[in-house]
Every structure is written in structure tokens, then in C-alpha cells.
Amino acid sequence: MTRGGPQRQARASEDVAAQLMKSFYADGLKPGEWVGTEATLAERFNVSRVTIRDAVSGLAARGLLDVRVGARGGLRIASSDPERLIDAFSIQLRLMGLSREELFEAMLAIEPVTAALAADRASAAQLSELRDLVEESSRAADDLVTFTSVAVAFHHAVAEASNNRALRAALAPLRATQLEHLAPTTTPAIAQRVVRAHADILAAIEAHDALEAGNRMRTHLSVVSHAPV
């Protein structure tokens, strides 16, 4: 193989992958729709099967394509799987060594909005889950490891109750980092304050008071962010 061969092959595969993505989006393809085989795509883009195979592998790893084998095999647009993105992003955040300050800046940017939306959109089942989490956190206030896990779960349940998939997906990768930063600094006194704050946020959500729910969440996060570490 000539010098630069692997690099040229990689660049060619990346170029084809970008073209494939652009083509799929332009065609408005939906999850489950058939897009061809390696052979048909290689012919369509006038590249080798190796180049197409590498491009397809990359797009499959990124969650865009589903590669199927057998008599009904071929390439299809993959079904939506936000958990795949969430897991990958969570790992990257942990590798970055996200600081406590950065974590709370992100939470303050997202969570007052999710609380306000939850006040307008939460279903009866979602409100019931929020009540259960507030009650569970109150019972666990003396078990700080369990308490922290339940308290973080409350915040993510509020995001679920916002019924906004983009905001939910933005917050979800922070969960592991939240546990890492909050668990070591939570005291019984802090736990009791958090329980009261969560109950107040829930009350505003139940009252369908979006402005107050957002304000209470913002105040709560500001107080916790300045707790001694």
C-alpha cells in the first residue's frame, strides 16, 4: 500500500459518510426506511465497497443506520435511541472533569425552564411520580447516599414532566456528574433544605404556576450551588 493510503481511505469514507447523511436528510427518510445495500450505494456514489463499508460502519456507530443481514438485509434508517447519545455524552463529561461550577451553570440554564414547562404540561402520572420522589427523599434524609440519588431523580422527573425531549436529553447526561459532585457535600441539614425546596417546586408545578415553578427552581439551584464544599 502506498504511503498515505490509510489516511486517504479514511478521508474518502468520511466524505462519503457526509454525503450519505446529507442525502438521507434531503430525502426526508424516516426510521425503518430502506436506503439500499453496500453494493447499490457504492454504485450510486461511484466509490469502492471498502469505502462504503467504512462509511456505513461509522454512521451505524453514530446511530443513523441499522445494518441488517440475511435475505431481507440491507441498510435502513435506525430508530431513534436517545439513550445512546446520553450514555456517550455522559462519558465525555466525566472524562472532561466537569467542575462543580460548570455543572451548576448548566443546571441553572436548563432546569428553571423544565420546571416552568412542567407546570403547564405535567400529566397526572408525572405529578404522582414527583410526589412520590419528594416523599421518598424526606424518608431518606438520614441516609445521604440514598437521599442524593432520590434528589437527583426528582430533578430528572421534572425534566420528564416538561414533555420537551430536547431539554430532557440535554439534562440527562449530567446525572452521573451530579451524583459525583453532590453526594460528598450533602449534609443532613442540606438534605432537609432540599426536601423543603423540592416540595415548594412541586407545589408550584401542581398549581400550574409556571413563573413561580421556574423561580423556585432557580432559587433552589442557586442556594445549593453556594453550599460549602
Q: What are the roles of these predicted feature ranges?
A:
Residues 37-38, 162-165, 208-209:
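Short loop-to-helix capping motifs
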Residues 172-229:
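C-terminal all-alpha effector/ligand-binding and dimerization domain
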Residues 1-108:
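Short linear motifs at protein or domain termini
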Residues 160, 165-174, 178:
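Short, charge-rich, low-complexity alpha-helical interaction segments
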